[in-house]
Amino acid sequence: MLFQTKRIILRKMTAQDTEIYHKWRNDIDVMQTTSPLLDVYRIEETEEFVNQIILGSCSSKCYIILEKQSKKPIGITSLINIDHKNRNAECIIDIGEKEVWGKGYGLEAMKLLLDFGFLEMNLHRISLRVFSFNGGAIKLYEKLSFQQEGRAREAIFRDGVWHDIIHMAILQSAYIEQMREK
């Protein structure tokens, strides 16, 4: 079913989600592997970001990941920079609740997002960027049939060391082929 599995539901992000997003955005452990800029944000800055960048954009679709049984928000996933003419988008995901890390929620959420992007929006290509030191995410994306397309060498400075940003993407045809094989 679109936007839910046995364990999670994706629902549209609203302004009421700002507080939980603010908590995740200020958790260095959560943002360490996904955000190029680590900082501490005031609630007003997060409110402005949510209203202008997330909710105010006509080129993105942003969803809160809910644990189905408890209805507790556990993360956020989005299609951003949606280009309707060329049928391309970029995807992002953050699992904000650390107690559910490593339990497969990210994989489920990404599958739902890809289903929506490819089977409902009829996108041709979905891309992402991942830090080279985020091995778990790279394995997850490869499991979903994302292919490495390139890398921005030494593009992120984290903990005193330069790291690459890996560019990955999956085409609609590859995604549909993968679905047939399963």
Write out the residue ranges for each language-model feature.
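A short, well-structured alpha-helix characteristic of acyl/acetyltransferase catalytic modules
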Residues: 1-47, 174-182
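Short loop/turn microsegments at loop-to-beta-strand junctions
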Residues: 21, 60-61, 151
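Acetyl-CoA-dependent GNAT
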Residues: 41-99, 171-174
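Active-site acidic-Proline motif in GNAT/NAT acetyltransferases
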Residues: 97-99, 103, 132-133
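Conserved acetyl-CoA-binding loop-helix of GNAT-fold acetyltransferases
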Residues: 102-116, 138-143
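Short glycine/proline-centered loop/turn elements that form peptide/ligand docking sites
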Residues: 106, 110, 133-137, 154-159
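Conserved GNAT acetyl-CoA-binding A-motif
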Residues: 119-129
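Conserved catalytic-core motifs of GNAT/GCN5-like acyltransferases
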Residues: 127-130, 147-167, 179
